[in-house]
C-alpha cells in the first residue's frame, strides 16, 4: 500500500476572520491547532495554502481583489497564520491558481464574483500577485524557508499558421501562463498583454513588481487534461 507522507490543506480566511470587525475566531484557531496535532501524530507533513478562493463576503462586497484593502486584510490573515502555526507548517503555498482568482472570475465570470470587466480583471491580476509577494515577505520574516505558489497551466496552440492566429495564441499564453511566470520570476509583465491591460492597471503598479518577484523556493503546477 502506498504510504502517504503529506497532507495538503488550506486555511479558511472566513473561518478565522468571520466578521469585518477584525476579531479573530478562537474556534477557528482551535480547529487548525487540532488539525496540525493530528497530522503530527500521523507523521504527515503539513502542506498549507494561505488562499484557496474563500474570500470573506464582507471583503467581496467592497470589491474583493480589485480593492487594495483586501490586500491589507490578506497580509493580516497571513501574519496570523505564521504567528500561530508557522513553525508547524512544512510547506507554504501563498495562493492557489491566481489565474482562476483573477481572469476566470473577473473576465469570464465563471467563478465568484462572476464579473465580466476588463478593468476588474486587470486590477485583480495584479493585486493577487501583490498579495502573493506580501505573503512571501511575511513568511520570510518568520524564518520560513519552504514557500511557493501553485499555478494552473495550459498548452496554447495557434489554430492555423496565419499571423493573426499566432498572435491570438501568444496573447492567450500570456493571459494563462506567462503573466504570472514573468511577474514572479522576472519582475515584469509580458509586453503584449500589458499593452492591453495597462490603462486599467492600478496606479504605480510597476513599483510593486519587486515585491511580487520575491524569491520563492518552489512552484506547484496544476495541469488539467
Residue ranges and their predicted role:
Residues 1-5:
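Conserved small/polar residues in nucleotide/adenosyl-binding loops
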Residues 11-26:
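Glycine-rich, proline-tolerant flexible connector loops at the mouths of alpha/beta enzymes
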Residues 19-20, 33-225:
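Active-site region of glycoside hydrolase catalytic domains
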Amino acid at each position: 500500500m502506498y504510504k502517504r507522507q503529506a497532507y495538503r490543506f488550506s486555511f479558511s480566511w472566513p473561518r478565522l476572520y468571520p466578521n469585518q470587525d477584525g476579531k479573530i475566531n478562537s474556534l477557528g484557531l482551535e480547529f487548525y491547532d487540532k488539525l496540525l496535532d493530528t497530522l503530527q501524530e500521523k507523521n504527515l507533513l503539513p502542506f498549507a495554502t494561505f488562499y484557496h478562493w474563500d474570500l470573506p463576503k464582507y471583503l467581496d462586497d467592497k470589491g474583493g481583489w480589485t480593492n487594495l484593502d483586501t490586500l491589507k486584510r490578506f497580509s493580516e490573515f497571513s501574519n496570523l497564520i505564521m504567528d500561530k502555526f508557522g513553525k508547524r507548517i512544512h510547506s507554504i503555498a501563498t495562493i492557489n491558481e491566481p489565474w482562476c482568482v483573477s481572469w476566470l472570475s473577473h473576465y469570464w465570470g465563471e467563478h465568484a464574483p462572476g464579473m465580466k470587466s476588463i478593468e476588474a480583471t486587470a486590477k485583480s491580476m495584479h493585486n493577487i500577485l501583490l498579495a502573493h509577494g506580501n505573503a512571501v515577505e511575511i513568511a520570510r520574516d518568520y524564518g520560513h524557508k519552504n514557500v511557493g505558489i501553485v499555478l494552473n497551466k495550459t498548452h496554447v496552440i495557434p489554430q492555423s499558421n496565419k499571423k493573426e492566429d499566432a498572435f491570438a495564441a501568444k496573447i492567450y499564453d500570456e493571459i494563462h501562463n506567462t503573466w504570472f511566470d514573468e511577474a514572479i520570476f522576472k519582475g515584469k509583465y509580458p509586453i503584449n498583454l500589458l499593452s492591453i491591460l495597462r490603462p486599467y492597471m492600478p496606479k504605480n503598479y510597476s513599483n510593486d513588481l519587486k515585491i511580487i518577484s520575491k524569491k520563492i523556493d518552489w512552484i506547484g503546477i496544476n495541469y488539467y487534461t
